[in-house]
């Protein structure tokens, strides 16, 4: 018997909604990255996008453990010499909390064409409302140890 290799037409996608309120950012990112890549499915293959859609709400209420809020820096580069910019995570969460969550998840996804396709299935919102009710998303509970 030959090994089964999933084809793009064989994959059924589901929508999950994750509430990020009081969830540690790293644990949220690993859970979302695994769902986006499809690693929770038995038909997972690294060369096929078998992942599901992920909606993250309450991104502004995400938790960073320890002193990371004041000490951890988020970097970006303009591409010009001397164009490295850094911002503390407490400033980033105050200004653009969606970007902080997207950046954490993006770091856990492969940096190639398939990774960009996987990231297009991620939707992050700072409030508790999202415009994807028509897709009937299923709530996904993140179980974690108390922080």
Swiss-Prot record:
GO cellular component, one term: cytosolic large ribosomal subunit
GO terms, biological process: negative regulation of translation; translation
A Pfam family: Ribosomal_L13
Keyword GTP-binding in annotation: no
UniProt entry keywords in alphabetical sequence: Ribonucleoprotein, Ribosomal protein
Molecular function via GO: mRNA binding; structural constituent of ribosome
Keyword Transcription regulation: no
Signal peptide location: none
Classification via HAMAP family: Ribosomal_uL13 (MF_01366)
NCBIfam families given in the database record: rplM_bact
Family designation: Belongs to the universal ribosomal protein uL13 family.
Role summary: This protein is one of the early assembly proteins of the 50S ribosomal subunit, although it is not seen to bind rRNA by itself. It is important during the early stages of 50S assembly.
Subunit note: Part of the 50S ribosomal subunit.
UniProt-recorded name of the protein: Large ribosomal subunit protein uL13
Organism this protein belongs to: Streptomyces avermitilis (strain ATCC 31267 / DSM 46492 / JCM 5070 / NBRC 14893 / NCIMB 12804 / NRRL 8165 / MA-4680)
